C-alpha cells in the first residue's frame, strides 16, 4: 500500500542483517532502496540524509545503537528532519539501546525491541507504533493485538517479557 505514494526506503549499511535482508527483499518488490552515508565515527550523516529526502520517501529505518561497534545514532536529529516529510515513516531498531541508555523517541513512528537482549526469552519482541492505522494486519482472524496480529495471546510469554524489562 505504501509503495503507491511513497516508494523510497532509506537505510544504512550499519543495520543488522535481519533488517538489511528485509530491505533487499522490499527492493525486489519494487521499492527504491537508498543508503545514507556514514560518518568516520560511525554515525548516520545527517547532511546526506537531508539530501536523500524527498516526498517519495516512505520509510527511514536505523538502529539506535550499533550492535558491533556501539555507536549511538542521532535519533533526535533524524526525527526532527523527518518531521518535515509527513509520508516518511521513521522506524528505529532499539534492540541494543533498551535498558542501556536513555532513549529519545520524539518524532519516531515505530520502535522495535527483542526480548533476549534484556534477559527475556528468545522469540519475544515488542513493536511500538505511534498510530496503528498506518499499518496493515500481518495475520488475520480473531482480531487480537488491535486487529494487527490475530492469534491467541501468549500470556505467560508476555508476563515474562515485562518481568525481564523490570529486572
Q: Model regions: which residues?
A:
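Pyridoxal 5′-phosphate
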Residues: 1-167
